Swiss-Prot record:
Organism placement in taxonomy: Bacteria, Bacillati, Bacillota, Bacilli, Bacillales
Keywords: Cell cycle, Cell division, Cell membrane, Cell shape, Cell wall biogenesis/degradation, Magnesium, Membrane, Metal-binding, Peptidoglycan synthesis, Transferase, Transmembrane, Transmembrane helix
Principal location: membrane
Enzyme Commission identifier(s): 2.7.8.13
GO cellular component labels: plasma membrane
Name recorded for this polypeptide: Phospho-N-acetylmuramoyl-pentapeptide-transferase
Membrane topology classification: Multi-pass membrane protein
Length: 324
C-alpha cells in the first residue's frame, strides 16, 4: 500500500507539472514575463533574454496538490505536512514578489537584499513558532547514530540560519538550464528514502511530490530552456529542502546531500573574500557553474557534471545514515 502511494505520488506530481506547463508558458509569454539577463553574466546567456520566468508557480502548484491529495488518501494533513507546505508556499510567494519586481517593474535586481532577508526571517520565525508549539525536538542528531545534542533555544538560531542560508544557496544554483531542477530532484529523492526509512511517511510523500514536480518541470527547463523557475521556484525549493532536513533531524546530513548547493555558495563567498582582501578573483566568475562555462565547458556538460556530483553526494548521504 505504502509503495503504491509513493509511486502514485511521483507520477501525479510529474503529470501535473507537465500538464500545467503548456498552459502557463504561453500565458507568461503573453504577459511578457520574460527573464532579464544581467550584463555582467556570461555573454552566451544573452540569447536567453525574454525566456518566460516565474515557472516555479507550476512546481509549487504541483507539489501542493499532489502532497495534499496523497496525504489525505494515506492518513490526514499532519503538522509536518502543514509546515512543509507553509515554508514552500511562503518562500515561493517571496520569490514571486522578487520575480514580479524584476519582470514587471523592470528592476533587474528585484527585491533589495534587506527586503528579501526580512521576508525570509519572518517566514522562518513563524515556522519555528509552530514547530516549537508542536513540541518537535530541538536537538540535532549525529548522522548514522542515535546520538542527539539538544540545543535548546540555540536551535531557533540554527533554524533561522538554515532557512535563510539554505534558500539562498539553492537560489544561487539556479543559473543554467536544468541545473537546479536536476540537482533538486536528486536531493529530495535522497531525503524521501531517508524519511521513509524513519517511517516519516508524510515527509517522504512530500519529498517524492517535489521529485515528480521538478522532473515534470525539467521537461521544459532542460537545455534549451523554454521556461525558467525564477526565484519563485528556487526559494521555494530551498526552503522546502531545509524543512525536510529539520523534520527528519538530518540537519548535518543536509550539508552532504545538498553538497552542490553548499559548494556553489562557498564559491561565491570565497570569490568575494579573495577580491576584497587581495583584489584578485579565484574563479573566472561565481557561482562555480559560471566558472566552468567561461573555461570552455558547454552548458550541458556543466549541468550533467553537477547532476553527477549531486547524485554521488546523495548516495554518500544515504550510506552514512543507513549503512555506516
Amino acid at each position: 500500500m505504502l509503495e503504491q502511494v509513493i509511486l502514485f505520488t511521483i507520477i501525479m506530481g510529474f503529470l501535473i507539472s507537465v500538464l500545467i506547463s503548456p498552459i502557463l508558458i504561453p500565458f507568461l509569454r503573453r504577459l511578457k514575463f520574460g527573464q532579464s539577463i544581467r550584463e555582467e553574466g556570461p555573454k552566451s546567456h544573452m540569447k536567453k533574454s525574454g525566456t518566460p520566468t516565474m515557472g516555479g508557480v507550476m512546481i509549487i502548484v504541483s507539489i501542493a496538490i499532489t502532497a495534499i491529495v496523497m496525504t489525505q488518501k494515506f492518513s490526514h494533513l499532519s503538522a509536518e505536512m502543514f509546515l512543509l507546505l507553509f515554508v514552500t508556499i511562503g518562500y515561493g510567494l517571496l520569490g514571486f514578489l522578487d520575480d514580479y519586481i524584476k519582470v514587471v517593474m523592470k528592476r533587474n535586481l528585484g527585491l533589495t537584499s534587506k527586503q528579501k532577508l526580512i521576508g525570509q526571517i519572518i517566514i522562518a520565525i513563524v515556522f519555528y513558532g509552530v514547530y516549537h508549539y508542536c513540541h518537535f525536538s530541538t536537538g540535532i542528531r549525529v548522522p548514522g547514530t542515535h546520538l542527539s545534542i539538544d540545543l535548546g533555544w540555540g536551535y531557533f538560531i540554527l533554524v533561522l540560519f538554515m532557512l535563510v542560508g539554505g534558500s539562498n544557496a539553492v537560489n544561487l544554483t539556479d543559473g543554467l538550464d536544468g541545473l537546479l531542477s536536476g540537482t533538486a530532484a536528486i536531493a529530495f529523492g535522497a531525503f524521501a528514502i531517508l524519511a521513509w526509512n524513519q517511517s516519516q511517511y508524510d515527509v517522504a510523500i512530500f519529498s517524492v511530490a517535489v521529485v515528480g514536480a521538478v522532473l515534470g518541470f525539467l521537461v521544459f527547463n532542460a537545455h534549451p530552456a523554454k521556461v525558467f523557475m525564477g526565484d519563485t521556484g528556487s526559494l521555494a525549493l530551498g526552503g522546502a529542502i531545509v524543512t525536510v532536513a529539520i523534520l527528519t533531524k538530518l540537519e548535518i546530513l543536509l550539508v552532504i546531500i545538498g553538497g552542490v548547493f553548499v559548494i556553489e555558495t562557498l564559491s561565491v563567498i570565497l570569490q568575494v573574500i579573495s577580491f576584497k582582501t587581495t583584489g584578485k578573483r579565484i574563479f573566472k566568475m561565481s557561482p562555480l557553474h559560471h566558472h566552468y562555462e567561461l573555461v570552455g565547458w558547454s552548458e550541458w556538460r556543466v549541468v550533467v557534471t553537477f547532476w553527477t556530483a549531486g547524485l554521488l553526494l546523495a548516495v554518500l548521504g544515504i550510506y552514512i545514515e543507513v549503512w555506516l
